[in-house]
Design a protein with these regions (language model features):
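N-terminal start-of-chain detector that recognizes signal peptides
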Residues: 1-5, 44-47
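N-terminal acidic leader/helix
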Residues: 2-35
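Acidic, low-complexity intrinsically disordered segments
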Residues: 25-77
Length: 77
């Protein structure tokens, strides 16, 4: 699970600080372009399951059109 904190909208981008559950020292910053839905910044450097699920959750939050929450969680089975 990825804990997504400090979700914020910056112009046409959405950004968040992401923490890997159980590994709180491992975190990454993710920034997604809302128009193209592509990753602009990923401080983890690589695309893996954590980044993918955080990206999917951020996209889903943006597409709902509601106000962005401050915190969210991305879970998978």
């Amino acid at each position: 699970m990825v804990v997504i904190k400090n979700i914020r909208r910056i112009d046409h981008k959405v950004a968040a600080d992401c923490y890997i559950e159980g590994k709180e020292t491992e975190h990454f910053y993710l920034e997604i372009d809302v128009l193209t839905m592509e990753i602009v910044t990923n401080t983890l450097g690589e695309m893996n399951a954590y980044v993918f699920h955080a990206m999917q959750k951020l996209k889903a939050l943006v597409l709902t059109g509601n106000k962005l929450p401050a915190t969210a969680m991305s879970m998978w089975c």
